[in-house]
Amino acid sequence: MQIKMFDENHEIDLEEAINEFLKQDIEVIDIKYQLAIMMDFKEQIYCYSAMVIYNTKN
């Protein structure tokens, strides 16, 4: 069993990164998703992250 971590500033970037990774010949066991928001004086900062738990097919 292995994991791959993803961390992006925009949800579309996270989606694209995960979809590209999933093109590999792997068996996905689970995907965990998290959204973190930080307030700055001028703006809100979003952090979209995911962890893909998978097995390689050998």
Feature annotation, model-predicted:
Residues 44-58:
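C-terminal edge-of-domain segments
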Residues 38-43:
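Short proline/glycine-enriched turn/loop segments at secondary-structure junctions
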Residues 6, 28-31, 52:
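Hydrophobic beta-strand residues in large extracellular and virion-surface proteins
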Residues 3-26:
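Short, well-ordered alpha-helical segments
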Residues 2, 27-30, 47:
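Localized chelating/binding microdomains
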Residues 32-37:
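Generic short beta-strand segments
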